[in-house]
Design a protein with these regions (language model features):
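C-terminal substrate-recognition "lid" of short-chain dehydrogenase/reductases
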Residues: 114-117, 209-238, 243-244
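Active-site helix of classical SDR
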Residues: 117, 152, 160
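Substrate-binding pocket helix/loop in short-chain dehydrogenase/reductase
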Residues: 92-94, 98-106, 201
């Protein structure tokens, strides 16, 4: 897939999944704008890939509107938006989760995604073309002890469908990717601190492994590309088979690899 001549904006683009998307789009010819709350990190990545950096807190609607206007004025109309900005949540019992914790997750993961999609997507719709890929999560598809994060990501999936319907005849496609347990720096830190058990995460997936940021980026690029020109409003899980494997635990778990059977 070539993205030569395309302008791509990545929110939360300086680390994790966002950084993988930024690098991969740049490698395939796109002019990439790395936006992030951490401007220094965004500038370092932009310098590495030959892109542009911009400070952006997606939780503020006006900041997204200003970023969309500034990028268009400096570089031209945006062709691709990837909304990867997000914050995580520790698994806590509902009564231990503070109102401030919930508000921050909702502000960034749900409202922030909405702010960016509308700020850039409305301009795409007026121009008659564009592709948006939102980053949701399998946490928005199943019950988990993530009482703020899971509902916020479920909302991202549904807003993706709503925007796809509204902008479809204006030439704008909107799709979601739902990552499974992805070996980002944040998850790697949690594993190193003993907060997550990598064996449990791997064994819960049909493929027996975790997902990489590059796995997610490949799916994002496909949905953003012309190869997906007839695809809009979908949610694509990229989870190494976690969703399909969960119910097998009630039947004794997944079978071993065929090569290990007698």
């Amino acid at each position: 897939m070539s993205f030569t001549g395309r302008i791509a904006v990545i929110t939360g683009g300086a680390s994790g999944i966002g950084a993988a998307c930024s690098r991969m789009l740049a490698e395939r010819g796109a002019r990439v704008v790395v936006t992030d709350r951490d401007l220094a990190r965004a500038e370092a990545l932009a310098q590495e890939i030959g892109g542009t950096a911009l400070a952006l807190d997606v939780g503020h609607r006006a900041a997204n509107d200003e970023a969309a206007a500034e990028i268009e004025a400096r570089l031209g109309p945006v062709d691709i938006l990837v909304t990867s900005a997000g914050v995580l949540q520790r698994p806590l019992r509902a009564e231990l989760l503070s109102e401030a914790d919930v508000e921050e997750v909702v502000r960034i993961d749900q409202i922030g995604t909405w702010n960016s999609a509308v700020a850039f997507g409305a301009r795409m719709a007026r121009r008659g073309q564009g592709s948006i890929v939102t980053i949701a999560s399998i946490a928005g598809m199943r019950s988990m002890p993530l009482h703020a994060y899971s509902p916020a990501k479920a909302a991202v999936i549904e807003m993706t469908r709503c925007l796809a319907a509204e902008w479809g005849r204006s030439g704008v496609r909107v799709n979601a990717v739902s990552p499974g347990f992805t070996l980002t720096p944040a998850l790697a830190s949690a594993i190193a601190a003993g907060e997550r058990d990598p064996g449990l995460l791997e064994n819960a997936a049909a493929q027996g492994r975790m997902v990489t940021p590059e796995d997610i980026a490949e799916a994002v690029l496909f949905l953003a590309s012309d190869a997906a020109r007839s695809i809009t409003g979908i949610n694509l899980p990229v989870d190494a088979g976690w969703l399909v494997a969960g119910s097998w635990a009630t039947y004794g778990g997944l079978p071993p690899a065929r090569g290990n059977l007698p």
